Amino acid sequence: MQNKGLVICVAILLTLASIFYLSFSVATSFYDGQAATIKDPIARQDYKDSVKYLGLYSYQKCLETQIGLGLDLKGGMNVVLEISVPDVIDFLADHKQDAAYQKALEIAKQEEMHSPKDFISLFVDAFHKVAPGHKLAEIFATQQLKGKVSTQSTDEEVEKALREEVASAIDNSYNVVTNRIDQYGVVQPNIQKLEGQEGRLMVEMPGIREPERMRKLLQGSANLEFWETYNNQEITPYLTQLDQRLANGETKVDTAATDSTKKVQAKAAATPKFALNKNNAAKGEDAQMAALKKMHPLLSMLQTIPGDALSLVGYAYVRDTAAINKMIYGSLAKQILPSDLKLLWSAKPEDGLNKKNVYGLYALKVTTSDGRAPLEGDVVTTAKDDFDEHGRPRVSMTMNSEGAREWAALTKANVGKAIAIVLDGVVYSAPRVDGEISGGQSSISGNFTIEDTKDLANTLKSGRMPAPAKIVQEEVVGPTLGAQSIEQGLISFAIAFVLLMLYMIVMYNFIPGMMANLALIANLFFTLGVLASFQSALTMPGIAGIVLTLGTAVDANVLIYERIKEELKLGKGMKQALSEGYGNAFSAIFDSNLTSLITGVILLVTGTGPIRGFATTWIIGIVISFFTAVFLTRLVFENRVSKDKWMNQTFTTSFSKNFMQDKNYHFLSMYKTTFTVWGVAVLVCIVSFAVRGLSRSIDFTGGRNYVVTLNKPTHVEDVRKVMQGAFVNTVGENAGKPATTTVIALGTDGKTVRVSTNYNIDSNNPAEDDKAETILYNALKKGGFVSQASVQNFKNPDIREGGSIIQSAKVGPSIAKSITYNAIMSVLLAIFFIFLYILLRFRNIGFSVGSIVGLVLDTTIVIGCFSLCYGWIGFSLEIDQTFIGAILTVIGYDINDTVVVYDRIRENLGKHKHNLAKADIQKIFNDSINQTLSRTINTSVSTLIVLVSIFILGGDSIRSFSFAMIIGIIIGTLSSIFIASPVAYLVLGKKIEKRSKELAEVPVEA
């Protein structure tokens, strides 16, 4: 083998990198264990803040770098974001104070609570009632609707424009949230537009380790403002006076407030260094500190800055900000401080030793009559993170022409002063203006890290939403089926892995089997290491990618070993057999991996959420499995053989010696029968789609989910009987009709069920949620399944004894149009490019047609099995986003299997290239299928070992996935033999037959 040195170097680098990145997971687990022994929460946090892994990395960095589990496996953050449609309307009206407009707005808000109509219809109706004879154009002929609404516009035209703008605002907010969360890569966000709740988004984020940062990221409306400022020396005397008046007891201020009221969000500007009095940092209230606070209620906590510090007036510890806010924003402060003064905190704590919890207070000057900033962020057209001339991270911005003019005027009027750059009420930077800035090019610089600038640039370039997104619901969700299911899944996966290793030894002898097993372990180790380096969270679709990767890795070793067996059978020596075995297997391995890689790359580029997570893991696994199976194992084999070791090594055992050897099944002669069988199977699936449909989860149908723990183990059928007819719709076109309600068992303890219903799902009234929970409580209590004294206790997930709701959700269709479109397009593009690659690689359309026909039929049958089987077997077969991952895995496996068969057909056709017209094409196809039959069966069995183990031993959260995979592998294996190959034969055979006739008609010269 050539380039052995390069292979060794890459292997060493991969090993070291994987050890390094995976060590963060070990370190985090160790630190968490140590911290758990500390009872005092402050001391526990201090311990975490003090640790330095390897002397360099903080606990927070360890958290960020470790490989985590996704929301479906570990839990994470679940929020509902609301983009207020009334706020959007008010923005479009330029915040007019017209009495009729304001009254109509309030009426519409009240009616929206109980009306099925959308807000715009309610508002238009209310406006016509409140202001008869007046036109909507009088309100909405604003700068925001310039070009769409004029004073001459009709009410119909205005209403149309409002609908377009509101839809655009909601879509934009969806895109904003998607773009911001996508920065986390494989974290697999689940973003849903909640049907029936206009302007609401639900966002699930697995394994979020910094909820504060995510809250800022999600709620940041990119509401950027540029403010004029006071000089600190102008404001300090006022603060001193306020401090004295407070000390005199003119007003009562609670200076013992904790920092719980003030959660500083965002980042900070560059500021001069300072030193707080150490007494201020003391944790206890000693007599001296108490006396100091009595003498100086404000300035004992807020340290002012002597000298010229521009707009920065002082510093304070974050725990003191709540008390300071009460003083500087209180009624006494309004009497003393300038009326045009606006005090805002910095966004990020001051850097430096013992100053990570210290924030700056800035003095802004209000110069407009309406109290708004003189320049706002809607003039910013682009924003990107880069570095200044000193190599420090910053964010560069470009403004539009209007903003450039206003910015030039603003900077010209404030030369020598600071301009505060404020995002959502906190100061990011307050740089000194050295001169007029023209051209619209500016930058936000300060005490930033690279991560800070990336977050800020991402927020700014996402666009300025007319109404900020607000978190109206937030919860930390546990794993889908609990820790027990996860533990079962891990155990089953481990058992499957061991069985797979034993299988390779049984089939290929101890040494070759162990070599394949070591390659498998290395593949898994490297894959996890690379995922950890990406700071990825492992999700169920990600596991799908790993499962497919293991199959690909085993497949490569099986291909190599089967070719080596063939060479040894021909009487060749071990050195030659190894060389030719690896060489002859290379093209099949390369083609099968590349077709899988094509699918993965397209899914990564066009997919979102679970599809993207699956694709990322799959791509990593494909590349690494190719390296470990093709290069690492060969390196070891050749090293041993070069030392005259393993010269008599066999690649069979007594069990496998004659397995599928010298078989000659006539597969092609039975294609009519197999086509008929496949056609009937597909027809049955289509009929099932039409008659039974699919068991779609609320991800697709909308509805309410309640995961409930019961007070005793019970049969799920008994719960179904109790819930039957309990929910009756009271609103909408289904009023008076029973709501669709399903109950399934979760876990294995018999005490956890999930109740799903579409009860009043079309209602916009939040009170319906409480009604639904009350109905659920009454029904379960009547049946004796819960014994809580009140519905309030039943709704409290912390009160498990007696039964309670431990997780709930109300959703519309999960996969919004854009995600559905991207998912469909990604699969279609993958199929198209697979078709194109096989056409170019195999130089015949027959192979392309055969592979695509096989993929389409296989996918149809897998989905059809879910349609046929749901409700008949004892576990959920719902169609959800995890199922998408399973289908993609099936497609990847099937094309891998098919390409290997095609590669052998191509090789055998090449042996007859000079007399192909006279060759027996059917025999060549049959021989090729028979020659790869051992490989086909071994690969399928080895992968099925993994999946059957997971299916039997794993929890419910992975059972439907493994079920789909089992069906897909069985069908895909048969398809590569009985569908893909015969279709290719029929297309290729006709072409060769036509060529033979043409040659036969050519006259032979005498």
What does each of the following model-derived ranges do?
Residues 22-28, 49-50, 64-75, 81-424, ...:
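Non-transmembrane, solvent-exposed regions of membrane trafficking/translocation machinery
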Residues 12-15, 426, 513-535, 546-553, ...:
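Small-residue-enriched core segments of transmembrane alpha-helices in multipass membrane transport
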Residues 204, 439-443, 451-499, 775, ...:
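Juxtamembrane "pre-transmembrane" interface segments
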Residues 8, 522, 529, 566-587, ...:
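Hydrophobic alpha-helical transmembrane segments of membrane transport and translocation systems
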Residues 1-21, 27-67, 87-128, 156, ...:
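Interfacial helix-loop-helix hairpins and adjacent transmembrane helices
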Residues 177, 480-500, 552, 572-608, ...:
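Pore- and gate-forming transmembrane helices of large, multi-pass membrane proteins
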Residues 551-595, 638-643, 873-938, 986-999:
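Cytosolic juxtamembrane regions of multi-pass inner-membrane proteins
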Residues 2-4, 395-396, 400-415, 419-420, ...:
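Interfacial segments of transmembrane alpha-helices in multi-pass membrane proteins
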